[in-house]
Amino acid sequence: MEDYIKIEKIGEGTYGVVYKGRHRVTGQIVAMKKIRLESEEEGVPSTAIREISLLKELRHPNIVSLQDVLMQDSRLYLIFEFLSMDLKKYLDSIPPGQFMDSSLVKSYLHQILQGIVFCHSRRVLHRDLKPQNLLIDDKGTIKLADFGLARAFGIPIRVYTHEVVTLWYRSPEVLLGSARYSTPVDIWSIGTIFAELATKKPLFHGDSEIDQLFRIFRALGTPNNEVWPEVESLQDYKNTFPKWKPGSLASHVKNLDENGLDLLSKMLVYDPAKRISGKMALKHPYFDDLDNQIKKM
């Protein structure tokens, strides 16, 4: 740790305090995440350290790079590249009645998908994507942060500050207690974020797991084995769920054109096996008119 100087606290992450820091020798500005683990006395599990070490290999223009992993007093510090703004703060800063430019929505979604495809191709899931861990710079680049941390440390129910970890971006298979899930969980999250890029409002903002599920069901219909084979045998599926009929996504997401709504609907398919992959999403006609400059990035 002697290589880094803490400058100021910049936030509370899922796992602990995040500081802005500077490397003593190079002067490089970094984000320092202090990981607080449930079982402080046992120190950091070796499995977590192994997982985290693998993440240093994830190098991509749309992934926040993990530069260093340090231990101090049995505390783990993760040193990341520093970006000053996250997507939630940016969305909150757009004045009432105004929206993000549609070409920027498209560019951000394209970059998010490129980042996710890169990680998925290396068998790394995110599992906890949300606007707070999408970081942006002033050049129009967006990067995914906190990749792979869920697998290394688990996702706590509450942040150590007792703030509840958001459920708004969580896929229905996770909410219904599926033991086996894979890359489609991230695509669902990106779909909900896509809608929020367009409208500035979370698409499904539940305040409990059941409220979250019911908000999804009201919009997309209550799933059954017909639309999603085996869903009725998932751990938390109840036959007593109200049977809502599918509504129209267009009524919830006003600022997307036909192609945008089509892509969104493919990302929000109930059956994870039929949900569009990141790779296929990048080929969707919605991106046909994306500035070529961005595609080359």
UniProtKB/Swiss-Prot annotation:
Crosslink (Glycyl lysine isopeptide (Lys-Gly) (interchain with G-Cter in SUMO2)) position: K6, K9, K20, K139
The keyword Mitochondrion appears for this protein: yes
Post-translational modification (record): Phosphorylation at Thr-161 by CAK/CDK7 activates kinase activity. Phosphorylation at Thr-14 and Tyr-15 by PKMYT1 prevents nuclear translocation. Phosphorylation at Tyr-15 by WEE1 and WEE2 inhibits the protein kinase activity and acts as a negative regulator of entry into mitosis (G2 to M transition). Phosphorylation by PKMYT1 and WEE1 takes place during mitosis to keep CDK1-cyclin-B complexes inactive until the end of G2. By the end of G2, PKMYT1 and WEE1 are inactivated, but CDC25A and CDC25B are activated. Polyubiquitinated upon genotoxic stress.
Catalytic activity: L-seryl-[protein] + ATP = O-phospho-L-seryl-[protein] + ADP + H(+); L-threonyl-[protein] + ATP = O-phospho-L-threonyl-[protein] + ADP + H(+); [DNA-directed RNA polymerase] + ATP = phospho-[DNA-directed RNA polymerase] + ADP + H(+)
PANTHER family associated with the record: CELL DIVISION PROTEIN KINASE, CYCLIN-DEPENDENT KINASE 1
Biological role stated in the UniProt entry: Plays a key role in the control of the eukaryotic cell cycle by modulating the centrosome cycle as well as mitotic onset; promotes G2-M transition via association with multiple interphase cyclins.
Name of this chain's protein: Cyclin-dependent kinase 1
Organism of derivation: Mus musculus (Mouse)
